[in-house]
């Protein structure tokens, strides 16, 4: 793929100005944050994911995993199984500064899903697509509608052209349809572990093919933050109560354990019980608010 002749993904420091990040989302549709996650966080997260990868797949119905080819491994629900994700990555202040600005027209937001994909050698490139398959409503939004979904891509191994770094078509969030783009319209999101790729709703992108013949698979965790007006793809309501109460208030909000507030004219919120706040009815404690 020839990438030198076209504008590339902007790469920002993790402490860059949030207004600049949001401008890039509106102008380009995506950008990379360099070194957002420290090495020890990435290392801890990878160890926890190694444990999950070693568990034999459950018997019975697997609605999504069974649709993947054999050289594509999938681990769902990392918010429940990986403490590093739910207690550190999920509440990262930079990610939430971006989300608060990004979702300001639609109100509160929460996590829709977070799962691991491990892509081994021989996996072909994905077709170009938008991240709207879980909630087809997004496909019918007019271009001028405020965004209601944000994709956050965490590389946990190196992303290179050879092992299938994500391919992003800058500015494609302004297209009316995905169509059939050529691969050379995209730019490569080559990244190191700890970097993060932030992708605006409607941006056309694809995972590249893994053309390596040896070495580790490409490992990535995909997290999707949606307006609370959309039902999450994964539910976290089956998490043990003691696990939930070990989290911060923000973490609990992201996983649907507290009442949330869309934008006006909604005046009371959603996720209510008997016209009361969910957390009050449950008498829910939190790590940063025990009483």
From Swiss-Prot:
Annotated catalytic residues: 68
Pathway(s) of this molecule: Mycotoxin biosynthesis
InterPro entries: Phytyl_CoA_dOase-like
Alphabetic keyword roster: Alkaloid metabolism, Dioxygenase, Iron, Oxidoreductase, Virulence
Metal-binding keyword on record: no
CC cofactor: Fe cation
Reaction(s) catalysed by this chain's protein: fumitremorgin B + 2-oxoglutarate + AH2 + 2 O2 = verruculogen + succinate + A + CO2 + H2O
Domain of life assignment: Eukaryota
Coiled coil residues, start to end: none
Xref: Pfam families: PhyH
EC number: 1.14.11.38
Gene Ontology annotations of biological process type: verruculogen biosynthetic process
Keyword Transcription attributed: no
GO MF term (any one): dioxygenase activity
Class of the enzyme per the UniProt entry, highest EC level: oxidoreductase
Subunit structure: Homodimer.
The family this protein is said to belong to: Belongs to the PhyH family.
Entry function: Verruculogen synthase; part of the gene cluster that mediates the biosynthesis of fumitremorgins, indole alkaloids that carry not only intriguing chemical structures, but also interesting biological and pharmacological activities. The biosynthesis of fumitremorgin-type alkaloids begins by condensation of the two amino acids L-tryptophan and L-proline to brevianamide F, catalyzed by the non-ribosomal peptide synthetase ftmA. Brevianamide F is then prenylated by the prenyltransferase ftmPT1/ftmB in the presence of dimethylallyl diphosphate, resulting in the formation of tryprostatin B.
Protein name in the entry: Verruculogen synthase
Gene: ftmOx1
